[in-house]
């Protein structure tokens, strides 16, 4: 029994020496004693290749490469102890979830924390750490007793409570495992116990290579190996000079020095012979003087400079994507020009979550075979999502999001249907569920679902159309596709008495859905498209899910569990599933994490993402215990993993390892922005490298090749897939700025695409975008007639929409596009309710021959409650009755109607105008409808403007009859003559024109009436600020002022007094007008003469004719208006359709100038020739 150290700096040949010794021994004695070669898990594959890479050694039974966990399997198979069931990470998380749920009420700190994302991952890591550091539950309990007895501060009490929770959960976990199961950490403890019984290890020659430190658990394994083996050889990256000096935590080799001393101490304790250490002083790895210099002087202070050309390259990239593309181009160059193989190249990085997706995409585009040494989670695979969402459907009462997450996995689809057809139908089905607010019991009820197109609150026709019946049948068919398998599983889960039966219910759910066949179809499709990675995913996921169910049954099969706990535990297990890495092929670029990689002897290394806070890593407190808490436990004798401070001290060694992997070339790069455009800073590590290599230039990598020289641009020509975007970029430059010197070269590349049989069609679609202009072409007369017909019948709102944006009008009224209907109460629904409620109250008053003035406040309250109760079942598929929240909202809406009724009562008492008609239709046909506003357009098309007028008021005096329009609005609004001029506010003046043109309708003896004005009535329940001692009357007066109607009224003092008979001088509390003492109007009055009203009405006719002409002539310009801070695009539903983009030459707003009312009126006169 002896111990031998082989030490040396990086690249000194430690592994090579050991491998050569083994190979020589195998050549001399192929059947001698066992030779064990122990390496970290990540090194096993490459070490096996290296071991049998010699021409004289093509294979061996005597020598085997192991990691500690693989050695545990080997020994336990030999001597026994492997009969207990292995539980993987997913199983551990599931068991911990169950333990936490059952212990929840007794936990002090983790009761709420258990609901946070990642909690069980951290808890599992903490328990694994306890085991690796030989800390038992009883040790943790003793620590809690010690802490609890001496806790005085809040921080100490928190730590004591945290340790108490950990002790409870750790103890329960160990009790659940004992005698039945083994987790990955238990294998190492068993290995310690079983190694003395192993004949396989006894007398073996043992090499331990590639480690820098050992956990206490691993150190115990090393102890047993030294006792059982003939000789143990351990390699450590360590400078011999360091051993001659006192240990300093700032030393580069501090960690490996401690490891060296710990192992020697173990050897002394076991009286193991310690052979003379073999120090290796040469640098055989490095074929480059620059890399040899970097390794030899890495830790020197001040930095030792290397002058002259170096094989170290530094790149700064515009962004992360440009950085990865730069790496891809250089890899292709090395392979093409310098005879590198892909396996000679490695890419090292730390923040893989930012890079992996981009690297997969770009390396595939650049045709670079690659292997990412990182396990991917299965959480996004359709099968995992299907199980998780189906369980959430059942435990969460059939919520919309869970149902359609399950639907979108496409595993609920019948096996024999076309997926494309089913997707379209399910999209329609989802729209129905959103519109009708389908969830909860409606899914499980046997009552068929109904489909009716919503028309209006006044539509009481119960007849169903053929198209509605057809849609209803489809909806119920699709409902059964979705709910039938889930309801079957739901019934089985509710009947289940044990976890085993619940797992069986999940399995039967998958089997009845033909999931294995569907996954096989997905695998075949992936293989046919050349995506072999995803093809294997579909195989792995089924096996892992079945293994998870087996583990669940093995651990907890006979236990009873609530459905919610079963769902939580299953979800926790599913989240922990990972795809196994496919072993790399013989010729791939290796992409690996800096902290976990153990690669060696690659020719070129690319270290990417070298940004501040990443390399070196910024300090982060992660996991269950903070650094301060770890220090407290360490002081009390419990050794755990290194603190953040210790980890930061080890960063220099990690970076040293990182830059000493390559034999010939080292590339270091960092992006200046991430994928979202956020600024990133270069790491101080790059500055260190620049100081060591002052002649090395920092090259900037960009995706914009315009500023590069011709020779630099040539490097951007890679694969056809990648190069096409750069061709586009250059041709865009030519299009905008004309000929450039380098463009002739890019014309040659362009000619390749247009002449290549393979690429001609593919590239034409992309290149056609060069001449793309986001401009809508005018419709032909024939198309316009097909869309709009020979007779246009439209509302005033439609005409205003055209003037806001012609393309929005085309999308809504030409193409009939609309957003999908969602079961929610929007502003239009509330507006419709307000209109209907006030109309019902007014109709009741008319039937009773009463007016608003006749109502008492109590009657206002009663009537508002009655009409809201009548309307609620009719509005938006009974939305106001659908939940407690909406019931509360119904009460708030009733209060608004009540308040509005009171104000209308006050207005009626103060006004000579009385309502003579409500919700007056014009151009609608039928009894009571006024005629439309009709136009004969120059191209022969007839146009009718139709609509519905909220309220018509009439007043009479000795000067004649006056009519005014009242429009109810759920938001504050005034009449802006500038918007009238631009055709954006035509509604009120149109209504006034219609009623004055048909004045005889409301006059007993016929005749004409004069326009009295147009006013907006704001329906709301305002809050007013008053002094503390204000009386109720004063408060009511302030509220009344909040309801002052804005608009435009006739500039006649008598008419204004008819509107507010309390007005003598000053401002009216009812309308936006006021009188001075001399009888003239105040400056703030919104008034117009009768002649001006006539001009305005004439202008409205003129505007409608122009709009009708443009519509019928096919004008669909993408030209939204912008006026001050208002723009047509702000609330437009069609932005994703028109793709309006101000950065494009053809896309600019129509900027409308704001004007005073007098200026707008003058322009209106000019347009119509008015006086």
UniProtKB/Swiss-Prot annotation:
Cofactor requirement: Mg(2+); [4Fe-4S] cluster
UvrD-like helicase C-terminal domain span: 281-587
One Pfam match: UvrD_C
GO biological process: double-strand break repair via homologous recombination
Binding sites annotated in the UniProt record for ATP: 8-15
Keyword terms: 4Fe-4S, ATP-binding, DNA damage, DNA repair, DNA-binding, Exonuclease, Helicase, Hydrolase, Iron, Iron-sulfur, Metal-binding, Nuclease, Nucleotide-binding
EC class of the enzyme, as a word: hydrolase
Enzyme Commission code: 3.1.-.-
Molecular function terms, GO-annotated: 4 iron, 4 sulfur cluster binding; 5'-3' exonuclease activity; ATP binding; double-stranded DNA binding; helicase activity; metal ion binding
SUPFAM superfamilies, sorted: P-loop containing nucleoside triphosphate hydrolases
Cofactor note: Binds 1 [4Fe-4S] cluster.
Binding sites annotated in the UniProt record for [4Fe-4S] cluster: 805, 1129, 1132, 1138
Domain UvrD-like helicase ATP-binding: 1-390
InterPro entries according to UniProt: ADDB_N (IPR049035), DNA_helicase_suAddB (IPR014140), DNA_helicase_UvrD-like_C (IPR014017), P-loop_NTPase (IPR027417), PDDEXK-like_dom_sf (IPR011604), PDDEXK_AddAB-type (IPR038726)
Additional remark text: Despite having conserved helicase domains, this subunit does not have helicase activity.
PANTHER family for this protein: RECBCD ENZYME SUBUNIT RECC
Function comment: The heterodimer acts as both an ATP-dependent DNA helicase and an ATP-dependent, dual-direction single-stranded exonuclease. Recognizes the chi site generating a DNA molecule suitable for the initiation of homologous recombination. The AddB subunit has 5' -> 3' nuclease activity but not helicase activity.
Similarity comment: family membership: Belongs to the helicase family. AddB/RexB type 1 subfamily.
Complexes and interactors: Heterodimer of AddA and AddB.
Name of the protein in question: ATP-dependent helicase/deoxyribonuclease subunit B
Native source species: Bacillus cereus (strain ATCC 10987 / NRS 248)
């Amino acid at each position: 029994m002896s111990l031998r150290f082989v030490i040396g700096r990086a690249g000194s040949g430690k592994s090579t020496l050991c491998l050569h010794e083994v190979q020589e021994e195998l050549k001399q004695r192929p059947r001698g004693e066992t030779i064990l070669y122990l390496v970290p898990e990540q090194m096993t594959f490459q070490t096996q290749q290296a071991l049998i890479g010699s021409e004289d050694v093509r294979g061996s039974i005597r020598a085997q490469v192991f990691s500690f966990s693989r050695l545990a399997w080997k020994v336990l198979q030999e001597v026994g102890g492997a009969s207990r069931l292995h539980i993987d990470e997913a199983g551990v998380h599931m068991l911990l979830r169950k333990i936490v749920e059952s212990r929840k009420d007794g936990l002090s700190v983790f009761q709420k924390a258990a609901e946070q994302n990642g909690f069980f991952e951290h808890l599992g890591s903490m328990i694994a750490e306890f085991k690796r550091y030989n800390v038992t539950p009883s040790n943790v309990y003793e620590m809690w007793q010690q802490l609890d007895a001496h806790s005085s501060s809040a921080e100490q009490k928190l730590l004591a409570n945290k340790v108490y929770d950990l002790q409870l959960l750790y103890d329960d976990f160990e009790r659940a495992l004992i005698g039945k199961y083994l987790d990955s950490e238990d294998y190492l403890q068993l290995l310690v116990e079983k190694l003395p019984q192993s004949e396989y290890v006894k007398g073996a020659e043992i090499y331990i290579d590639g480690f820098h430190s050992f956990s206490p658990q691993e150190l115990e394994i090393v102890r047993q190996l030294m006792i059982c083996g003939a000789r143990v050889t351990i390699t450590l990256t360590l400078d011999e000079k360091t051993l001659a000096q006192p240990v300093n935590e700032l030393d580069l080799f501090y960690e490996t020095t401690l490891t060296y001393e710990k192992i020697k101490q173990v050897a002394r304790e076991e009286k193991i012979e310690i052979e003379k250490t073999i120090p290796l002083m040469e640098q055989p790895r490095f074929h480059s003087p620059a890399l040899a210099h970097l390794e030899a002087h890495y830790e020197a202070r001040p930095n030792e400079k290397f002058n002259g050309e170096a094989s170290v390259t530094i790149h700064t990239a515009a962004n992360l994507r440009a950085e990865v593309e730069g790496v891809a181009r250089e890899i292709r160059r090395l392979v093409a020009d310098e005879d590198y193989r892909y396996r000679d190249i490695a890419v090292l990085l730390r923040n893989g979550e930012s890079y992996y997706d981009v690297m997969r995409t770009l390396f595939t585009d650049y045709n670079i075979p690659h292997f990412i040494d990182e396990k991917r989670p299965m959480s996004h695979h359709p099968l995992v999502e299907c199980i998780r969402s189906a369980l959430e459907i059942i435990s969460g009462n059939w919520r919309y999001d869970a149902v359609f997450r399950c639907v979108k996995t496409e595993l609920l689809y019948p096996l024999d249907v076309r997926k494309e057809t089913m997707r379209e139908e399910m999209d329609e089905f989802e729209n129905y569920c959103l519109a009708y607010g389908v969830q909860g019991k409606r899914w499980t009820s046997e009552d068929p679902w109904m489909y009716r197109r919503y028309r209006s609150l006044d539509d009481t026709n119960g007849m169903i159309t053929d198209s509605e019946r057809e849609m209803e049948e489809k909806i119920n068919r699709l409902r059964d596709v979705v709910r039938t398998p889930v309801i079957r599983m739901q019934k089985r889960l509710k009947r289940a008495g044990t976890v085993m039966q619940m797992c069986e219910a999940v399995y039967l759910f998958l089997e009845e859905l033909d999931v294995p066949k569907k996954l096989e179809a997905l695998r075949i499709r992936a293989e046919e498209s050349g995506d072999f990675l995803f093809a294997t995913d579909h195989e792995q996921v089924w096996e892992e899910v079945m293994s998870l169910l087996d583990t669940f049954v093995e651990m907890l099969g006979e236990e009873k569990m609530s459905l919610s706990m079963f769902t939580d535990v299953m979800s926790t297990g599913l989240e922990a599933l990972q795809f196994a890495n496919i072993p790399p092929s013989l010729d791939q670029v290796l992409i690996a994490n800096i902290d976990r990689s153990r690669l060696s002897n690659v020719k070129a290394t690319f270290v990417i993402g070298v940004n501040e806070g990443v390399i070196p890593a910024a300090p982060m407190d992660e996991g269950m215990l903070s650094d301060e808490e770890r220090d407290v436990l360490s002081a009390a004798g419990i050794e755990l993993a290194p603190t953040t401070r210790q980890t930061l001290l080890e960063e220099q060694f990690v970076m040293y390892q990182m830059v000493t992997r390559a034999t010939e070339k080292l590339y270091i790069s960092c992006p200046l922005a991430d994928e979202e455009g956020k600024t990133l800073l270069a790491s101080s590590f790059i500055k260190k490298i620049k100081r060591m290599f002052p002649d090395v230039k920092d090259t900037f990598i960009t995706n914009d090749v315009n500023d590069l020289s011709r020779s630099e641009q040539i490097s951007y020509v890679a694969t056809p897939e990648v190069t096409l975007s750069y061709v586009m970029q250059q041709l865009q430059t030519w299009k905008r700025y004309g000929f450039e010197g380098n463009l002739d070269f890019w014309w040659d590349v362009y000619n390749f695409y247009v002449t290549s049989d393979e690429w001609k069609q593919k590239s034409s679609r992309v290149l056609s975008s060069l001449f793309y202009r986001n401009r809508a072409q005018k419709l032909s007369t024939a198309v316009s007639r097909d869309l709009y017909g020979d007779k246009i019948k439209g509302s005033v709102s439609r005409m205003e929409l055209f003037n806001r944006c012609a393309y929005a009008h085309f999308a809504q009224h030409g193409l009939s596009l609309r957003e999908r209907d969602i079961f929610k109460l929007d502003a239009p629904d509330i507006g419709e309710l307000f209109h209907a409620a006030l109309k019902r109250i007014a109709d009741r008053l008319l039937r009773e021959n009463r007016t608003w003035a006749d109502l008492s406040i109590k009657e206002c309250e009663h009537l508002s409650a009655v009409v809201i109760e009548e309307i609620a079942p009719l509005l938006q598929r009974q939305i106001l009755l659908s939940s407690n929240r909406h019931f509360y909202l119904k009460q708030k809406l009733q209060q608004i109607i009540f308040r509005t009724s009171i104000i209308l009562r006050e207005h009626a008492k103060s006004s000579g105008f009385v309502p003579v008609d409500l919700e007056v239709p014009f151009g609608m046909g039928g009894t009571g409808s006024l005629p439309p506003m009709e136009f004969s357009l120059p191209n022969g098309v007839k146009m009718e403007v139709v609509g519905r007028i909220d309220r018509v008021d009439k007043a009479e005096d000795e000067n004649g009859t006056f009519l005014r329009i009242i429009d109810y609005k759920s938001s504050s609004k005034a009449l802006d003559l500038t918007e009238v001029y631009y055709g954006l506010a035509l509604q009120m003046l149109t209504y006034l024109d219609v009623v004055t043109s048909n004045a005889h309708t409301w006059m007993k003896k016929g005749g004409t009436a004069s326009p009295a004005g147009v006013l907006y009535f704001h329906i709301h329940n305002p809050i007013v600020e008053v002094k503390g001692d204000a009386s109720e009357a004063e408060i009511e007066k302030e509220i009344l002022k909040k309801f002052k109607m804005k608009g435009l009224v006739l500039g006649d003092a008598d008419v204004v007094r008819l509107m507010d008979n309390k007005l003598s001088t000053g401002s009216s509390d009812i309308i936006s007008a006021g009188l001075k003492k001399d009888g003239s109007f105040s400056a703030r009055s919104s008034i117009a003469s009768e002649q001006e009203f006539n001009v305005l009405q004439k202008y409205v006719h003129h505007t409608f004719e122009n709009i009708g002409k443009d519509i019928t002539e096919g004008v669909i310009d993408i030209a939204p208006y912008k006026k001050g801070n208002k723009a047509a695009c702000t609330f437009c539903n069609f932005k994703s359709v028109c793709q309006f983009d101000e950065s494009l030459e053809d896309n600019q707003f129509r900027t409308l100038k704001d004007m005073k009312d007098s200026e707008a009126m003058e322009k209106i006169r000019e347009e119509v020739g008015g006086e």
